[in-house]
């Protein structure tokens, strides 16, 4: 089932320097909660500056949903320590509040009013909040409070020079973009390995169903918890953050211009369903527009091609201008075993896997095959640890045992690991291969199995509260290592000043901005 990557691996072993200078970044979301696990109803802490313009600390959907961002970094330990400093400083500013350590929220009552993230009075700030109002009215607020970790990854220029013979970013942007699209197609075909190893949401609180019927064969563990015995990541299931109306958009990952055309089509195609919501009620805006996507960010995807945008640019305009600059991997649940929701083992695994995705052959994929890849993901998400589970290839009928496919993949990953270890010294990447390979013989070693044992004993709420308390104490007591308190104070003040500047420079009425998004 795994493509034959032996030639590409032999090439890599002859050109190890092609992997010198991989760049990464991390984003981590987490809900602010009270000591009893209920959602905090306070505003974004003033000590954390402006959520609109702060470089490292912002908010996602809700005012209580923090998002932490690291700068681009070539050093894994430095990046994780930076992320930990942001957590340490934040933990000290939250008073009695904690950071929820799980992807799935728990103590949110059906119909509870969840305050949307607020970004001030500027047009861009108001548009961000209105976009969230649209998400709430389209999908419900509860789905939007699910948290994850995003891993941003780019291969060094040396890789593309050695692999494709490109000279620089400008002349090589077509070849580099094609290379990243190959990675994305492989990710759709084989990325289910991420929830298998690291999925950590095998259960949900009953409040999450909000009384809606479900066809999933949930088991009840008392204490208001529903779980699937072999599930890995309900966050990635249809219960979690997905968007059914998008499955027939026909967006593919074969060609940059085709991809962008599909995205632009979706933000201009009216939706009958969303038209029923309306645009305004009693003078209050309800969504940016009633198209299938209000803006490009609404496209739900487990992985995204990206380029840093310039002022006023949409994500797709940036891609057309400069090609794909990096890839955003979006399938990681919050790691409940780490105070910062992610650890070095995961980052190293993703390095290995994304390099493999860039090396392995990846035939073009129709939108039909893209939908078929979802079958494997759904199997792993809902019953990934089930003994004897099999997976298919695309829309074909042949089936292969997951455990064997995983072991075959790791045989390749080990060779990538040897190359990366030869550059960095030590055995860190090969050690990750040893640790994770064991999960295919013994699924009880996976994150989902480990956290489910605790959840069945303590409930989701009990597990989440205990971890939140432990990490709060730990983070508050640890000294800062890279950033100083003065750095955080300076960034708070600078971010507030930047927001004021944005607000002062607004020249057009908000309605004119909305008209451009119609």
Curated annotation (Swiss-Prot):
Q: Which Pfam families match?
A: Glu_cys_ligase (PF04262)
Which GO biological process entries does UniProt record here? glutathione biosynthetic process
**Which EC class is the enzyme in?**
ligase
Q: Which UniProt keywords apply?
A: ATP-binding, Glutathione biosynthesis, Ligase, Nucleotide-binding
The UniProt record lists the keyword ATP-binding:
yes
**This enzyme's EC code(s):** 6.3.2.2
- PANTHER family recorded: GLUTAMATE--CYSTEINE LIGASE
Instruction: Report the protein name in the record.
Output: Glutamate--cysteine ligase
The organism encoding this protein is Klebsiella pneumoniae (strain 342)
The gene from which this protein is expressed is gshA
């Amino acid at each position: 089932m795994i493509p034959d990557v032996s030639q590409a691996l032999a090439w890599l072993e002859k050109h190890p320097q092609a992997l010198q200078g991989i760049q990464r970044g991390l984003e981590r979301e987490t809900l602010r909660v009270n000591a009893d696990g209920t959602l905090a109803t306070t505003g974004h802490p003033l000590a954390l500056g402006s959520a609109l313009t702060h470089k490292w600390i912002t908010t996602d959907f809700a005012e209580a949903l923090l998002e932490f961002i690291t700068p681009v970094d070539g050093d894994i330990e430095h990046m994780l320590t930076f992320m930990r400093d942001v957590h340490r400083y934040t933990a000290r500013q939250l008073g009695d509040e904690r950071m929820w350590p799980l992807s799935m929220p728990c103590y949110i009552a059906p119909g509870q009013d969840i305050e949307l993230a607020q970004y001030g009075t500027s047009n861009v700030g108001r548009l961000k909040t209105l976009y969230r109002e649209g998400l709430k009215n389209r999908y419900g607020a509860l789905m939007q409070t699910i948290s994850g970790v995003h891993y941003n990854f780019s291969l060094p220029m040396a890789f593309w020079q050695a692999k494709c013979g490109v000279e620089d970013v400008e002349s090589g942007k077509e070849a580099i973009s094609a290379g990243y699209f190959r990675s994305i197609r492989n990710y759709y075909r084989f990325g289910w390995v991420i929830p298998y190893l690291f999925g950590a949401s095998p259960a949900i609180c009953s409040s999450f169903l909000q009384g809606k019927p479900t066809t999933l064969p949930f088991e009840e563990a008392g204490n208001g918890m529903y779980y699937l015995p072999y599930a890995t990541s309900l966050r990635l299931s249809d219960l979690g953050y997905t968007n059914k109306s998008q499955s027939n958009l026909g967006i593919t990952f074969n060609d940059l211009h085709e991809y962008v055309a599909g995205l632009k089509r979706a933000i201009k195609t009216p939706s009958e369903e969303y038209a029923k919501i309306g645009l305004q009620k009693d003078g209050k805006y309800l969504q940016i527009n009633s198209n299938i996507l209000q803006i490009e960010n609404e496209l739900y995807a487990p992985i995204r091609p990206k380029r840093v945008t310039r002022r006023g640019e949409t994500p797709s305009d940036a891609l057309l201008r400069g090609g794909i600059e990096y890839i955003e991997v979006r399938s990681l649940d919050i790691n409940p075993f780490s105070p910062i929701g992610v650890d070095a083992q995961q980052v190293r695994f993703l390095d290995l896997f994304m390099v493999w995705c860039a090396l392995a052959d990846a035939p073009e994929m129709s939108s039909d095959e893209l939908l078929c890849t979802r079958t494997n993901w759904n199997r792993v998400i809902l019953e990934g640890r089930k003994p004897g589970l099999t997976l298919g290839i695309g829309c074909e009928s042949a089936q292969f045992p997951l455990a064997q496919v995983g072991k075959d993949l790791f045989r390749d990953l080990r060779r990538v690991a040897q190359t990366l270890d030869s550059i960095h010294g030590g055995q860190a990447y090969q050690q990750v291969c040893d640790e994770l390979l064991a999960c295919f013989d013994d699924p009880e070693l996976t994150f989902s199995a480990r956290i489910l044992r605790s959840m069945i004993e303590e409930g989701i709420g009990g597990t989440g509260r205990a971890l939140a308390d432990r990490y709060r104490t730990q983070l508050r007591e640890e000294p800062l290592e890279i950033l100083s308190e003065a750095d955080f104070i300076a960034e708070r003040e600078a971010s507030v000043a930047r927001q004021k500047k944005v607000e002062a420079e607004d020249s057009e009425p908000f309605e004119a901005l909305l008209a451009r998004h119609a």
